[in-house]
């Protein structure tokens, strides 16, 4: 089932009720951004849930492994990613976009079953639970704009650049919270790094 959360006449209440159902495991890949949206919108964190990226890390697939890699490695399938950078705010969505959206979740059940069995066999359930505790904590999604810089990964030791990153991260967080949009839609981290490094003095720069 495809659900368009931007549809003006669609109530998402049944979906949120499902999120609260303790008898249904909700499976995500790289859940943090999705969970943050649900928490900001309804103060709900789906439970119980399973993050295939976290589980894959515990199973030795590496940190922050992508969904596409897991589909190839576990399911021996490929994904059509040609619609990834199309305009997802435009309506109606094209058939190709809807096919992409379906593909983005089609293999989650198979990946979940493979990883959960591997975790049980290796007796690493506690490792996964420890990682998921962070994602289940409401404090994870309550961001003070002053401290938004802590989420930004940088190797720079330049105090000027670090100060610029702190200001840019604070502005982005404030704006994203005011407009209720993902922070990456304001500007992404790589764009922030470039701005912090060059520190333009005018719009022309």
Kindly label every feature range from the protein language model.
Residues 1-118:
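Conserved DEDDh/DEDDy metal-dependent 3′-5′ exonuclease domain
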Residues 95, 111, 115-205:
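Accessory DNA-binding and partner-docking regions appended to nucleic-acid-acting proteins
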